């Protein structure tokens, strides 16, 4: 249910923002709101609290974000509060960002390596992945020494495993079949 609610609210806001050519600005402002919620868990708990009235929550939101976000985002937050959907704010923001990214053909990806990648190597891998996938890949590097060497790339739900660890496991499996 949470996913359905989040998608509905995100889609409604996206349609409004896209019509007014504000979808990028709204995305930035929603990301800011999400970071505020993540940085201050007590703030999120306050928003979800049934002990605080909707009007009090809207006053709090207004005092914090009035000068930092556009009226569309502020009104959207008011609607979320009026409908009792405060617990879904982070999920709604995540869904909204996915909608904007899909319009831009943008996909987040992770390159996992045993040691940090050089910036130029990361950019070259990003360019190659973008070219082969036809999408605007946004590549981040994560370090995991257990993969020994090579690179493991995760693009959405796809995995490209070019690690030494995987090659050794494959060789071990093939050798065990031969020896049995």
Curated annotation (Swiss-Prot):
It comes from the Bacteria. Signal peptide: none annotated. Gene3D superfamilies: N-terminal domain of the delta subunit of the F1F0-ATP synthase. PROSITE patterns: ATPASE_DELTA. It is a peripheral membrane protein. Keywords: ATP synthesis, Cell membrane, CF(1), Hydrogen ion transport, Ion transport, Membrane, Transport. GO terms for molecular function: proton-transporting ATP synthase activity, rotational mechanism. This is ATP synthase subunit delta. It comes from Alkaliphilus oremlandii (strain OhILAs). The lineage of its organism: Bacteria, Bacillati, Bacillota, Clostridia, Peptostreptococcales.
């Amino acid at each position: 249910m949470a996913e359905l609610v989040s998608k509905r609210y995100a889609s409604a806001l996206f349609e409004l923002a896209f019509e007014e050519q504000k979808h990028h600005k709204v995305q930035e402002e929603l990301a800011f709101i999400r970071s505020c919620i993540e940085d201050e868990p007590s703030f999120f708990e306050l928003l979800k609290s049934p002990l605080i009235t909707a009007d009090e929550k809207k006053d709090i939101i207004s005092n914090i974000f009035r000068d930092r976000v556009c009226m569309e985002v502020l009104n959207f937050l008011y609607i979320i509060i009026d409908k009792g959907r405060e617990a879904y704010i982070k999920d709604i923001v995540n869904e909204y960002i996915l909608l904007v990214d899909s319009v831009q053909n943008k996909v987040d990806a992770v390159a996992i390596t045993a040691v940090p990648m050089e910036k130029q190597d990361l950019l070259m891998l990003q360019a190659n992945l973008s070219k082969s996938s036809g999408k605007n890949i946004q590549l981040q590097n994560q370090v995991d020494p257990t993969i020994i060497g090579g690179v493991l790339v995760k693009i959405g739900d796809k995995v490209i495993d070019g690690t030494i660890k995987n090659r050794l496991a494959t060789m071990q499996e093939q050798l065990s079949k031969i020896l049995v």
